[in-house]
Amino acid sequence: MARIGRILTLVVFAAVGLFLFMGQTVEAKGPKITSKVYFDIEHDGQPLGRIVMGLYGKTVPKTAENFRALATGEKGFGYEGSTFHRVIKDFMIQGGDFTNGDGTGGKSIYGNKFEDENFKLRHTKKGVLSMANAGKDTNGSQFFITTAITAWLDGKHVVFGEVLEGYDIVDKIQVVPKGFQDRPTKDVKIVKCGELDMKEEAEGEGTESPSKPDSEKEQAPVRDEI
């Protein structure tokens, strides 16, 4: 009986070990990228290049679909022709206000605002794509791309994607000359955008687990605290 007990104990430990190993493997791969979109960027009328972003449609399907549809313009409105209205070096670049262009506007495909879907993903690296907001459950169309690790935004802003290609363009945007309220002095514009074919299954590197704006008018992540 003692021998049988030892065998059963070993089997249990082996099963637990296999379960933990499989869980770590899945986590290492990160959230699944289900669609890819692109922005073609100009600065002061001169081409900068293309940014390609992967969206985490399984972890945050509603938020990812909002961004995808605004990139394609299939609802009759979206990001094409809009600008990055706020850039802070070593923090983030922010855009998506295609109605007012100054951080006070924008809208989602679900109406003016929609709720925070979840905070399973964190701001663990450069190139994270996340929703700007004016507080709890105020997501519209404004978004930001991180240019540093911004852990203080975790649990406050919904991460829904990452930059796959063209991070050098993000780097160029974060250092453009700017004026009042961190607005570029010359337009950084999304001149063309849309969806790309998913020719290969891609996995992101996010980690499963971004604060109130400076004013009630401005939808934005917190000011630079790095």
UniProtKB/Swiss-Prot annotation:
Annotated Gene Ontology cellular component terms: endoplasmic reticulum lumen; fungal-type vacuole
Region (Disordered): 194-226
Domain PPIase cyclophilin-type positions: 38-195
GO molecular function, one term: peptidyl-prolyl cis-trans isomerase activity
Motif Prevents secretion from ER location, chain numbering: 223-226
TM stretches of this protein: none
Glycosylation: residue positions: N139
Secretion signal span: 1-28
Subcellular location: Endoplasmic reticulum lumen
Similarity comment: family membership: Belongs to the cyclophilin-type PPIase family. PPIase B subfamily.
Biological role: PPIases accelerate the folding of proteins. It catalyzes the cis-trans isomerization of proline imidic peptide bonds in oligopeptides.
This protein's name: Peptidyl-prolyl cis-trans isomerase B
The gene coding this protein: CPR2
